[in-house]
Amino acid sequence: MPVIPLGRLTLELPFCGTVAAGFPSPADDYLEERLSLDKYIIKNPSSTFFLKVEGLSMKGAGIYPDDILVVDRSLEPQPGDVIVAVLEGEFTVKRFVKEGGHYYLKPENTEYTPILLHADLDFMAWGVVTHVIHKPYEL
């Protein structure tokens, strides 16, 4: 999985307000302000990285191939978080769960099996996924 470190990127784009997902609202047809995406989605720039997704193990969480994950390495993973982990030397993205006193990496796709985290497993929680950037499409 390619890791893209975050530099001192600053990109400000026009922010046009809200958009109705139900009935259209012509009252919002004006420019409100400028929105800096890096300030909106990145809370800790020095510990935030982008990773490109491969595979379908997290499609139930809305994470698809070629999506970009925004990952904050300064956050401590909590049960329920989607995390990037290093498992046996390989990057993987899964949901971090606790069930019955045990911790698992749980895929969000029934075609994949949850991974029980135990002392003999080479595992490191690498960071917490804070945002997912993807195109609006269906698989």
Give the positions of each predicted feature:
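Aromatic- and Lys/Arg-enriched surface recognition patch
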Residues: 92-120
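Hydrophobic beta-strand signal
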Residues: 70-71, 84
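Structural motif
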Residues: 66-67, 81
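Short coil-to-beta-strand transition motifs
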Residues: 65, 87-92, 123-124
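Short, positionally conserved secondary-structure boundary motifs
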Residues: 1-59, 90-91, 98, 102, ...
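Short, hydrophobic/aromatic-rich segments at coil-to-beta transitions
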Residues: 48, 78-83
